[in-house]
């Protein structure tokens, strides 16, 4: 996990539905892991 993810996750959680935020988290995790 990078600082970029830590910054984006709250934004997605507030700006989008939780289910969408989970999908984004999975994509970001795959990209870095």
Swiss-Prot record:
Q: Which GO terms describe its molecular function?
A: toxin activity
Cyclopeptide (Ile-Pro): where is this cross-link? 11-18
Q: How is it modified after translation?
A: Processed by the macrocyclase-peptidase enzyme POPB to yield a toxic cyclic decapeptide. POPB first removes 10 residues from the N-terminus. Conformational trapping of the remaining peptide forces the enzyme to release this intermediate rather than proceed to macrocyclization. The enzyme rebinds the remaining peptide in a different conformation and catalyzes macrocyclization of the N-terminal 8 residues.
- Propeptide stretches are 1-10, 19-33
Q: Which of UniProt's keywords are assigned here? A: Thioether bond, Toxin
**What Pfam families has UniProt attached to this entry?**
Amanitin (PF24112)
The UniProt record lists the 2'-cysteinyl-6'-hydroxytryptophan sulfoxide (Trp-Cys) crosslink at 12-16
> What superkingdom does the record give?
Eukaryota
Q: Which NCBIfam families match?
A: amanitin (TIGR04309)
Other noteworthy facts: The typical symptoms of amatoxin poisoning are gastro-intestinal distress beginning 6-12 hours after ingestion, a remission phase lasting 12-24 hours, and progressive loss of liver function culminating in death within 3-5 days. One of the few effective treatments is liver transplantation.
Q: Which family does it belong to?
A: Belongs to the MSDIN fungal toxin family.
Report the function annotation for this chain. Toxin belonging to the bicyclic octapeptides amatoxins that acts by binding non-competitively to RNA polymerase II and greatly slowing the elongation of transcripts from target promoters.
Q: What is this protein called?
A: Beta-amanitin proprotein
Can you name the source organism? Answer: Amanita pallidorosea
Q: What is the lineage of its organism?
A: Eukaryota, Fungi, Dikarya, Basidiomycota, Agaricomycotina
